[in-house]
A protein has these predicted regions:
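Active-site-adjacent structural elements that line small-molecule/cofactor binding pockets in enzymes
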Residues: 1-314
């Protein structure tokens, strides 16, 4: 049975304690399986880096608007919800020291009794890397080393690690995650490097595609499975999940093969095609800039389509 989640209002004018809590609690009541928080630490006033996750290729949140911290938001929601999974989509690993953010993530997993999904990525905005004094060109290697260290932190008692970027000498790291044997790692990113990272370290490949067909998504996942096999892993240990933008319309819209736009019925039909190729979990980002209208779409989709989609079997 496939699962469905929605993105949280962690940025923009709507970002507040009350809307964040209401959005998560309402998603839980409506039957969504997960809520997702995006990650941004600073917002440069001038961004030349191409944004890969919008049709216009420009970042969608102005720099003078709030953007809450993803880890803090999920820690807050651990105490405001009971069942829904709490996900990062995705946390940029090179911005933070792995001992620090792993401690926070493990604490959230304990406080939520095992509901955290650790969505991780290497980042894309060179200007933000510069502000954080983080190595943009080495972000992939830094991220891989962090993921290697995490495995030690969550499974060993006397931890020693000597890497190119991080060194640890005989430390303890407790508590361990609530989930066993460790937190689920969902590796974001769309290209071959991300696919290899998911195959080596991930419990899921978790790309965000603005435009994608189920067939193309499956092609990418088959790359992940092949890479997993070459590393000696069982390919079945890595599942397929993804985030997809959604534009709901009041009436049927002309079909667009690579984009989820149309009536609730049209979007649900397209999502069934993603289930058919084996997508286990889909995070839906409803592309409405104003929060009240966005929440209305989240409610309408849940009432008119979600139960049948969750029950649909490929």
């Amino acid at each position: 049975m496939s699962k469905f989640g929605v993105f949280l209002p962690v940025s923009g004018r709507a970002a507040s304690r009350q809307t964040l809590m209401q959005a998560a609690q309402r998603a839980e009541a409506l039957g969504y399986d997960s809520v997702w928080a995006a990650d941004r630490l600073v917002m440069p006033w001038k961004i030349d880096t191409t944004y890969p996750y919008s049709k216009e290729a420009t970042f969608i949140v102005p720099p003078d608007r709030p953007f809450f911290d993803t880890l803090t938001c999920l820690a807050f929601l651990a105490g405001c919800t009971e069942r829904i999974q709490l996900g990062m989509s995705v946390m940029v690993m090179p911005y933070r020291h792995p001992l620090h953010w792993a401690k926070i993530a493990t604490t959230i997993d304990q406080l939520s009794t095992g509901r955290l999904i650790l969505g991780v990525g290497v980042g894309w905005m060179e200007e933000e890397f510069a502000a954080m004094n983080a190595p943009f060109k080495e972000r992939g290697k830094v991220s891989d080393e962090q993921l290697t260290l995490l495995q030690r932190l969550w499974t060993e008692e006397h931890i020693n690690f000597h890497g190119a970027y991080y060194r640890v000498e005989d430390i303890a790291f407790n508590p361990k995650p609530y989930q066993k044997p460790r937190l689920p790692i969902w590796v974001g990113g769309e290209g071959m490097h991300a696919q290899r990272r998911a195959a080596r370290y991930g419990d899921a490949w978790f790309p965000y595609f603005v435009r994608i067909t189920p067939r193309r998504l499956l092609d990418g996942f088959e790359n992940v499975r092949r890479e997993a096999q070459t590393t000696g892993r069982n390919p079945d240990e890595v599942k397929l999940a993804c985030c997809l933008p959604v534009e709901l319309t009041s009436a049927d819209a002309p079909p667009i093969e690579e984009y989820l736009k149309g009536s609730v019925k049209q979007v649900a039909e397209r999502l069934r095609q993603f289930i058919d190729v084996g997508v286990a979990h889909i995070g839906l980002q409803f592309m409405i800039p104003h929060y009240p209208e966005r929440q209305e779409q989240i409610e309408r989709f849940a009432e008119e389509a979600l139960p049948a989609l969750k029950a649909y079997q490929r």
